[in-house]
Design a protein with these regions (language model features):
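Contiguous transmembrane helix-bundle modules in multi-pass membrane proteins
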Residues: 43-47, 260
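A conserved hydrophobic secondary-structure block that centers on an alpha-helix together
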Residues: 1-43, 51
Length: 355
């Protein structure tokens, strides 16, 4: 794919390129490559990726992605990658993921949550549907699990973070509903200030404990609902966060979703402060058939008084070939800055020929 973005008052003209190759080998294995180029008058950012998937047997598999980036105007190079082992059966799932992102890794046509980090994230879920499960007319399965996460700073090797997600309770119901509870001890060593939603957390070492409840009804029903609620200590204070979702899907062609998210900080940061940030989301999906869809999305954020909406028309005119028309609108009004608005119109056509 090749795309050019014209020069504006705030940015120079930019050329984009994405190339992808993938090939199956053996009966259940795959190897592929991806190249991205972002070119501006100041220089180019080039990303080179190889990826692979190996099916060892019915239960076990390994997949990996390795990426190298170079930015020509700074001559900085970086690397990121992960390797993941899965062992999944009807009775359990075990996995181990090892990942690394170096300090100078810079994928300007992609997204990463952080740089300069090494992550080790194993996990295990146990699936029990046996005779000792009570209330079998109501309960389908008991699926406890543990999902620890460990992180080191890649440039120094210092241990900086751990989160020990432990789900002693996870219940799947015969109705399609679910309920889960987790308790999570967290250790974090911040090397620089951290600002979640306008709250400043000073560098230092923190230990805190959070509780987590997840519940939901059968999402295939006419009306479905779910809740994601967390509470507990948070760095040097407390945090309550919740996400409520309500979906209305009267027929397969129509789906409407309303979502409300709230984060309530209590005595958090330096200096200690309390605040509440709300996020409202509305989403609609309308399908004439599986190949022609109109999708709308609206979001309002109380943190910066921002509002944004997106309307997308998608037509799959032949298998894996699409025509898109997209309209984006965004605005935010946060004092003392004046209100700012952005609008984008995008038209895209893709064609895939299989040989």
């Amino acid at each position: 794919m090749v795309m050019r973005q014209e020069e504006t008052d705030n940015s120079s003209s930019t050329n984009f390129f994405v190339g992808r190759y993938s090939e199956n080998f053996g009966q259940q294995n795959r190897i592929g490559g991806l190249m991205t180029i972002k070119n501006t008058p100041l220089g180019s950012n080039i990303g080179s990726t190889i990826d692979g998937f190996i099916r060892i047997n019915e239960a076990q598999s390994i997949n990996t992605i390795l990426t190298h980036t170079v930015t020509t105007n700074t001559n900085k190079q970086g690397f990121a990658g992960f390797a993941q082992y899965y062992n999944s059966t009807n009775h359990y799932k075990i996995w181990l993921t090892q990942s690394v992102v170096t300090k100078n890794f810079d994928p300007q046509m992609g997204f990463i949550s952080r740089t300069d980090v090494i992550g080790t994230t194993p996990g295990m879920n146990w699936y029990y549907r046996g005779n000792k499960l009570p209330f079998k007319k109501i309960l389908r399965a008991f699926e406890p699990g543990i999902l620890p996460e460990f992180y080191w700073q890649a440039s120094t090797g210092k241990f900086i973070e751990s989160s020990l997600y432990f789900f002693p309770v996870w219940l799947n119901f015969q109705s399609g509903a679910f309920f889960g509870y987790a308790i999570t001890p967290v250790y974090q060593h911040l090397t620089e200030a951290f600002e979640p939603l306008g709250v400043t957390i000073a560098p230092g070492t923190y230990n805190y404990l959070q509780n987590w409840i997840l519940a939901g009804t059968d999402p295939s029903k006419f009306i479905s609902a779910s809740v994601d609620y967390k509470w507990g200590t948070y760095f040097n204070g407390k945090l309550e966060s919740a996400d409520w979702r309500l979906q209305f899907a009267p027929i397969p062609h129509i789906s409407l979703l309303a979502e409300f998210n709230r984060n309530h900080f209590m005595d958090v940061g330096e200096p200690k402060q309390s605040s509440t940030v709300d996020l409202f989301i509305l989403q609609g999906r309308f399908a004439l058939n599986p190949r022609i869809q109109l999708i709308g999305f609206y979001q309002k954020n109380s943190f910066d008084n921002s509002q944004s909406y997106n309307i997308r028309f998608a037509w799959e005119y032949q298998p894996l070939s699409y025509i898109y028309f997209i309209y984006n609108h965004g605005s935010f009004d946060k004092s003392p800055q004046p209100k700012q608005t952005e609008e984008h119109i995008i038209a895209k056509i893709s064609y895939l020929k299989q040989f």
